[in-house]
């Protein structure tokens, strides 16, 4: 038996004035058929009432306790874009953002700029005092930053003001150590250098001509050191792979030992080639026991507060699932399908609202649920579970779970 965990990033939502969500209103005949043929429930990736990040959520969904394994998002972002993070390195996730001359943020995602490869070159390889700067774009406005050198600490604050109209925050040490003080000073110097180098860069001059937001600042956050994590194959006995478009999810996969399968045209944006991803899932199942799949677009729409786009992306995912379910053997493959967190249109950010979940495959206890959405699956046989329950349930269905007790 084989298994797929299929995560629709940011899937969940809250009802609008008509009582609908993008998922409830979307035309999803395949998801609904899977719900009818499977076992359903609700799921909180980390815990009830906890607003999870995509990083902590995916760790939990893979069976890892995020409270003991998560040190910050930065190491996963860096790992995901191919940086080999070494002991002592300090890693951050970053946004390219638009700021004015006073560092007031005018667009947190620089107009969702799609190509920042030329801007990356301005920062990667810099040296500030005795610290080497490693900087890699990780798709669109996202990037990873690594500081390498002596006497560093991850006990520092973030630069992200989290809202437009606010100034990029100065980095401060969070303890009294000389290492934290030094690290904060290095990052503050880097932010000034970044603005000087990026503001007049030809890429941004061209964006100004086109009346597009410029990417003239980097905003680091999610600082952390590399955690020690048991490899997925050792933990489960399964040969695992990951198919995802974003650096963060690829980084989590690499950190736990999943092979990352790159798919052309799948970049984690709303324009991602979902049918190419569907084909890759079917092909990858020929060589692997387990696949973690992440489809990002609905989350992007949620963060933008775009109801119609989120609904449209969910309908495209349904078409993707149509291809997958028609080209795999239900008697040989289990699919656990859910989200990693809710990204409600009204919040434009992650929330702790529980997610619909289903498990589809041979010998599941089919319940009475007939539609896959936030309001229907609560009646299902899975009841209300946490993300860390998914892998044990799948392993039990696959008849590879170890018995607890005599």
Curated annotation (Swiss-Prot):
Q: What is this enzyme's EC? A: 5.4.2.12
User: What does it do?
Assistant: Catalyzes the interconversion of 2-phosphoglycerate and 3-phosphoglycerate.
A biological process (GO) of this protein is: glycolytic process
Q: What keywords tag this UniProt record? A: Glycolysis, Isomerase
Q: Name one Pfam family in it.
A: Metalloenzyme
**Per the similarity annotation, which family is this?**
Belongs to the BPG-independent phosphoglycerate mutase family. A-PGAM subfamily.
Q: What class of enzyme is it?
A: isomerase
Q: Gene for this protein?
A: apgM
Q: What is this protein called?
A: 2,3-bisphosphoglycerate-independent phosphoglycerate mutase
Q: Does the keyword Isomerase apply?
A: yes
The UniProt record lists the keyword Methyltransferase: no
InterPro entries (alphabetical): Alkaline_phosphatase_core_sf, ApgAM_prokaryotes, Metalloenzyme, Pglycerate_mutase_ApgM
What reaction gets catalysed by this protein?
(2R)-2-phosphoglycerate = (2R)-3-phosphoglycerate
What is a GO molecular function of this protein? metal ion binding
According to UniProt, this protein's pathway is: Carbohydrate degradation; glycolysis; pyruvate from D-glyceraldehyde 3-phosphate: step 3/5
């Amino acid at each position: 038996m084989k298994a797929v965990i299929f995560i629709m990033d940011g899937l969940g939502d809250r009802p609008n004035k008509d009582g609908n969500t993008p998922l409830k209103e979307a035309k999803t005949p395949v998801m609904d058929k899977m719900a009818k043929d499977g076992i359903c429930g609700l799921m909180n990736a980390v815990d009830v009432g906890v607003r999870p990040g995509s990083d902590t959520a995916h760790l939990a969904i893979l069976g890892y306790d995020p409270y003991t394994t998560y040190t910050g998002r930065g190491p996963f972002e860096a790992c995901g874009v191919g940086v080999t993070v070494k002991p002592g390195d300090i890693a951050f996730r970053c946004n390219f953002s638009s700021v004015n001359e006073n560092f007031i943020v005018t667009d947190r995602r620089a107009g969702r700029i799609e190509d920042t490869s030329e801007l990356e070159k301005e920062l990667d390889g810099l040296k500030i005092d005795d610290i080497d700067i490693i900087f890699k774009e990780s798709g669109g406005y996202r990037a990873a930053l690594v500081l390498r050198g002596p006497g560093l600490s991850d006990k520092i604050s973030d630069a992200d003001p989290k809202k437009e109209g606010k100034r990029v925050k100065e980095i401060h040490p969070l303890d009294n150590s000389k290492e934290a003080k030094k690290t904060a000073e290095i990052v503050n110097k880097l932010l000034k250098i970044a603005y000087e180098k990026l503001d007049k860069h030809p890429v941004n001059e061209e964006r100004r001509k086109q009346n597009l937001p410029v990417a003239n600042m980097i905003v680091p956050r999610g600082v952390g050191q590399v955690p020690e994590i048991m490899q997925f194959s050792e933990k489960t006995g399964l040969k695992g792979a990951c198919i995802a478009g974003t650096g963060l999810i690829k980084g989590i996969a690499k950190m736990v030992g999943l092979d990352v399968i790159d798919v052309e045209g799948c970049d984690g944006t709303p324009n991602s080639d979902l049918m190419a991803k569907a084909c890759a899932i079917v092909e990858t199942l020929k060589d692997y026991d387990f696949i973690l799949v992440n489809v990002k677009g609905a989350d992007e729409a949620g963060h933008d507060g775009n109801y119609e786009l989120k609904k449209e992306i969910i309908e495209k995912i349904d078409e993707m699932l149509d291809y997958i379910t028609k080209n795999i053997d239900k008697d040989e493959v289990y699919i656990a399908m859910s989200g990693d967190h809710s990204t409600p249109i009204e919040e434009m950010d992650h929330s702790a609202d529980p997610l619909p979940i289903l498990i589809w495959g041979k010998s599941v206890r089919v319940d009475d649920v007939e539609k896959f959405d936030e309001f229907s699956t609560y009646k299902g046989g899975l009841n209300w579970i946490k993300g860390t329950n998914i892998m044990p349930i799948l392993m039990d269905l696959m008849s590879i779970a170890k018995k607890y007790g005599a």
